[in-house]
Amino acid sequence: MRIGIYPGTFDPITLGHIDVIKKSLKLVDKVIVATTYNINKEYFFTIDERIEIIKKSLFNDLKLNKKKIEIISFDTLTINLCKKYKAKIIIRGLRAVSDFEYEFQLAGMNRKLSSNIETIFLMSDVENQ
């Protein structure tokens, strides 16, 4: 089974995030949407609220397959999360060229930490950015 981890704060989840999730479902058998907490960042919603909003958006509103999507919170390195769930793919969304530099560096660091885990970049459709 091909498992992908889609990490982010999702505060709140957007149409762009949802578009990336839908596109990633065409590439992997299961997507783990992993929301995190950063003490250096202010949030609109708590972790529990974000998880509930994600569930409602994906399962109630869009009726996406619950067997293909898992929603979790995490407080570790994404690479550690990949190892825990046996995921070989990290899914990242790009909105603009300005996102690429940061994401490229992050992907390189993750590659050094675990060479068998790939990062893929997906762009949401223009109307969802």
Predicted regions mapped to residue ranges:
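Nucleotidyltransferase catalytic core that binds NTPs
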Residues: 1-129
